[in-house]
Every structure is written in C-alpha cells, then in structure tokens.
Amino acid sequence: KEDMIVLKKSEKMLSINDAIQKLIDSLKKITNDIIIVSDRDKVICSTDKNFLNENIDERVINAIDERKILDGINFKVGKKVIEGKFYMSPVIVEADALGSVIILSNKEINDKLIILNNVINVIISMKLY
C-alpha cells in the first residue's frame, strides 16, 4: 500500500513536469529566449534540452534559499557558462521555496520577459499547491 502512495506521488510529479515542459515550450515561441525551471539545485525543465538535469548557478541556489529575485549576466548551467542576461524568480508554495523560473536572453531583460517569468512562476505554484 505504501508503494502505491509513492507511485501516485511520482506519477503526479511526472505529469506536472510534462505540463510545465509544454508550457515553456509554447512560451518560447513568443520570446525565443531560453526558459529554465529548476528544483532547488538542478534543471527539471528547459527549452534547451542540453540543460536538463544539470546543476544550476550557485547564485540561483542562494536566491532560492533567500526567496529573492535575481538578475545578472553570464549564467552557469552545469559546467557551461551562458553569456547574456538572465532573470530568475523563486517558486514558492506555502512558504516553501521549491525551485526557480529562469529566463536567459541575449538582449536586455525587459518588462515583457519579467511578466512572462512571473506568469510561468504563478502557474507552477498553482500546479504544485
């Protein structure tokens, strides 16, 4: 019986990851920028499949822990440094910081990208609640 409960939780998480992946793939068509969703230390969904399961930038891990928005230049994914600008917001559900939404861009981070990041974040938070 305990195995069934664990399996149901795993199935739910898999379906959430699938839904998030479809969402960010669709939104990439609007922006052409890279969108990454992470848990507390690894990429779980990305519009660039090369980043899946890679460790996220240490600055993002700290921002998740501190529940802070972060923006900057040159983002590290695994051992690769992606040149350009990034904007990250932590995914917070019931006061728990669970991960992040990150947009990587080769242009300035504008209001449209910030709003897009926030929309993705809200949808993920609602799915996990």
What kind of feature is each model-predicted range?
Residues 10, 40-42, 49, 106-108:
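Short, ordered loop/turn segments at secondary-structure junctions
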Residues 25-45:
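Short N-terminal helix-loop-first-beta-strand/juxtamembrane motif that initiates sensory/input modules
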Residues 40, 46, 52-80:
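Regulatory sensory and allosteric helical modules in signal-transduction proteins
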Residues 1-13:
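Short, structured interface segments
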Residues 26-29, 79-83:
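Short loop/turn motifs at secondary-structure junctions and domain boundaries
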Residues 81-92:
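A short beta-strand signature within small-molecule sensing/ligand-binding domains used
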Residues 2-5, 91-101:
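Short hydrophobic/glycine-rich mini-motifs in sensory/regulatory modules
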Residues 12-27, 55-66, 72, 98-100, ...:
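Juxtadomain coupling helices with adjacent low-complexity linkers
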